[in-house]
Structures are given as structure tokens and as C-alpha cells.
């Protein structure tokens, strides 16, 4: 069910996360290495752990808080944070093969599909 406050929470959080990612890129992606992107991804990995942990400690917090911070803000900042949380969940459950497999497939798949997307765009531009 779409609750207007939830819809707003995701949108505002996503805008803030995207703006931060953009600002990090402007400030730090200047030396040939994407330090701003790395900061967004690694920071997002830390923040999703922190936020999910706090939400677990505070079940009384309303749903819009999680939606604004996790789905919105971290979704706008990076989807890498969700991936990190999922791998850690496998590790916490002792599913080391699943964790490794998911990490390898996610990274290799993302790199391959990025290359494929670039190649497709190149072909479309001919």
C-alpha cells in the first residue's frame, strides 16, 4: 500500500543521497581515481550497517524512518550498500559459499554489463 508519507520519505531521502554522491564526485573524482565514488560506496556500506543496526535496536521507530534512510538516502547515494548488507547477512548465517558466490557474480556481472552497455551505446552511435 502506498502511504503518502512513505512515498515522500523515499523521495526526499533519495534526492539527498544523490546530491551527496554528486558532491563527493565533484570534490574528489579529480585525480584519475574515483575517490568520491569509492567514498560513497564504502560510506554507504558502513551506513547501511549502522542504520539497520539502529533500526533493530529501535523497533518503535516508524516505517518512514527506514524508508527515508535506507531505501531513499542510501539508494540515492549507492546501491552498493544494499549489496554489502546482503553479503554480510550470508556471512552472519554461516553461508560462506553463498556470500562469495553472490559477491563474485555481482561484481563480475556488474563490470561485464557496464562494458556491454558502453558497447551498445557505441554501436547505437554509429
Swiss-Prot record:
Key word Ion transport present: yes
Main location per the UniProt record: membrane
Keywords of this entry: Cell inner membrane, Cell membrane, Ion channel, Ion transport, Membrane, Metal-binding, Sodium, Transmembrane, Transmembrane helix, Transport
Cleavable signal peptide: none
Catalytic activity entry: fluoride(in) = fluoride(out)
Membrane-protein topology: Multi-pass membrane protein
Regions crossing the membrane: 5-25, 35-55, 68-88, 99-119
Any single biological process term in GO: cellular detoxification of fluoride
Means of activity regulation: Na(+) is not transported, but it plays an essential structural role and its presence is essential for fluoride channel function.
Subcellular location: Cell inner membrane
InterPro entries (alphabetical): FluC (IPR003691)
Protein role: Fluoride-specific ion channel. Important for reducing fluoride concentration in the cell, thus reducing its toxicity.
Protein name: Fluoride-specific ion channel FluC
Lineage, uppermost ranks: Bacteria, Pseudomonadati, Pseudomonadota, Betaproteobacteria, Burkholderiales
The encoding gene: fluC
